[in-house]
Amino acid sequence: MHIVVVSVNHKTADVSLREKLTFSESSIQQALSALINQKSILEGVILSTCNRTEIYAVTDQVHTGRYYVKSFMSEWFDVDIETIKSATDVKVGNEAIHHLFKVITGLDSIVLGETQILGQIRDSFLLAQSEGTTGTVFNKLFKDAITLAKRAHAETDISSKAVSVSYAAVELSKKILGKLENKKILIVGAGEMAELALQNLVGSGATDITVINRTAEKAKSLADQYGGRQVSLQELQCALIESDIVISSTSSQEFIITKPMMQDIMKLRKNKSLVLIDIAVPRDIDPEVNDIDLIFNYDVDDLKGLVDANLAERERAAQVIYTMIDKQVISFVDWINMLGVVPVITALREKALRIQATTMDSIDRKMPNLSERDRKVISKHMKSIINQILKDPISQAKEVSGSENRAEELQFFQEIFNITNEVESIKNNEPEVRRSKNSFVFNPEQ
């Protein structure tokens, strides 16, 4: 039994190929069914986001498992197998476990430490579980991964520091003015940077938002999407008079906001302070507005310093999380190794209990007048003797779980105690690796 992950991400393939290798939300259930019916694959989870497509599988053999996962991707996406091979990164065993933990904690994301991937993996796992394509191994592995990611974000500040200019603009606004719920915010521009700023503003509680753009239709579309209002470019000066925060991001080659304009506006504002954040290149705001009292003006260079400092803090937090990951990998591998030992220990205990029961039956026949108290005393001492005799063999069996030759050593262990048939019987009566749809469902809130 082996854990395999086949990954297509921003490091292995360009966006034009990643677009072709993406599962639509409506197709994943069907894809899971097709995946689990491939040869060699015992359990499966599919993760598909805008930046990565990953297939996690428990396989009976490493080489055949890798082959059939890639073959499945080739058939599903109608892409030749050589393209799949060149566009994928394959990890097996401990490396596959480490990869999942690294991805779910945000350490493999374009934005270091982002938290969205945690929810995406959680949803992918729960869907696979509901479809019956996970079992003993993945139910444990993904539960551990989700718990680890929550702990990593709770115990470090890796996701709390802005590492994009648009997000930094919003964080700077909060630092200067505090909560944004009652602040009047003006967005000048309707491009990608402006939209990212809007997303973060709304996420930070801002509700009073005005959008201005040279193209009114774009401004209205963006304003409607985020619950704001749109005004024309001709109303810019009126909007500046009313605003507490201005974030500007246009493609203009000239200043949109000039020093003379702001001198007039500040008089009408009755000396109320104004925060100007210019995230455009070239700049939208004349840097000479810095000479005007009560104007706090910041450009991309100011924000870049904040972003660089925050990124350095995230990287320090990442090192802490890597230590958490290493420990969790060891813990999970120990658990995996114990799966093969448990039937052996169970068989040994059951054999000892049968010997005890047979011996007690013999005592009862030969000493029929024993009182109930005497029987309990004898039984108690027999259990004590059995536990003492089994203590060292069981301890040795657990030690074997970490050995590279554990299969051979466990077989030798079974032969010494003559429990090979009992072990096979226990294995045959265990639940299948892959569970049914009605099996236990992991609750991620527990």
Swiss-Prot record:
GO molecular function: glutamyl-tRNA reductase activity; NADP binding
PROSITE patterns recorded: GLUTR
Record pathway: Porphyrin-containing compound metabolism; protoporphyrin-IX biosynthesis; 5-aminolevulinate from L-glutamyl-tRNA(Glu): step 1/2
UniProt site positions, description: Important for activity: H99
Active site location: C50 (nucleophile)
Domain of life: Bacteria
Gene3D superfamilies registered for this protein in UniProt: Glutamyl-tRNA reductase, N-terminal domain, NAD(P)-binding Rossmann-like Domain
Stored SUPFAM superfamilies: Glutamyl tRNA-reductase catalytic, N-terminal domain (SSF69742), Glutamyl tRNA-reductase dimerization domain (SSF69075), NAD(P)-binding Rossmann-fold domains (SSF51735)
Alphabetized InterPro entries for the sequence: 4pyrrol_synth_GluRdtase, 4pyrrol_synth_GluRdtase_dimer, 4pyrrol_synth_GluRdtase_N, GluRdtase_CS, GluRdtase_dimer_dom_sf, GluRdtase_N_sf, NAD(P)-bd_dom_sf, Shikm_DH/Glu-tRNA_Rdtase
Domain notes: Possesses an unusual extended V-shaped dimeric structure with each monomer consisting of three distinct domains arranged along a curved 'spinal' alpha-helix. The N-terminal catalytic domain specifically recognizes the glutamate moiety of the substrate. The second domain is the NADPH-binding domain, and the third C-terminal domain is responsible for dimerization.
Protein name listed in UniProt: Glutamyl-tRNA reductase
Organism: Macrococcus caseolyticus (strain JCSC5402) (Macrococcoides caseolyticum)
